[in-house]
Amino acid sequence: MATKLIVIAFLCAALIAVVQSAPQYAQGEEPTYDEDDDEPIKPHSSADPDASYEEFDPSQLTEYANTAQDPGRRPHFLEQANSNNGDQLPSQSDSSSESTEH
């Protein structure tokens, strides 16, 4: 009985899949498409293609920006930070002795 229900459910699912994949127009009828050839083509970029490169000022690239230091690019910054933190934090031997006393 259970196998019959499984087979019927599978056949219903297959029928639904076939019906949904069928074209949505009758046989012999040609599908119609929107004729939008008269619309102008829009560029993908928002940049003005008529703008010249002379407006670009390369001296702006050398101006300093007030941003945080990147430790990944400045390993000496990491060394300085580690030496400063080492003075403030207790050593590992101190923390291990404290945990055994409790």
From Swiss-Prot:
Signal peptide: 1-21
This protein's record includes keyword Secreted: yes
Disulfide bonds: none
Keyword Calcium part of the UniProt annotation: no
Transmembrane segments: none
Major localization listed first in the record, in broad terms: secreted
Ranges for region Blocks active site cleft of host thrombin in a reverse direction compared to substrates: 70-73
Stretches the record annotates as Disordered: 25-102
Superkingdom of the organism of origin: Eukaryota
Gene Ontology cellular component annotations, sorted alphabetically: extracellular region
Biased composition range(s): Low complexity: 91-102
Compartments it resides in: Secreted
Keyword terms: Secreted, Signal
Residue stretches of biased makeup (Polar residues): 59-69, 80-90
Family annotation (InterPro entries): Thrombin_inhibitor_anophelin
Ranges in coiled-coil conformation: none
Family: Belongs to the anophelin family.
Role this protein plays: Salivary protein with anticoagulant activity that inhibits host thrombin (F2).
Quaternary organization: Interacts with human F2 (thrombin); the interaction results in thrombin inhibition.
Protein name per the record: Salivary thrombin inhibitor anophelin
Originating species: Anopheles funestus (African malaria mosquito)
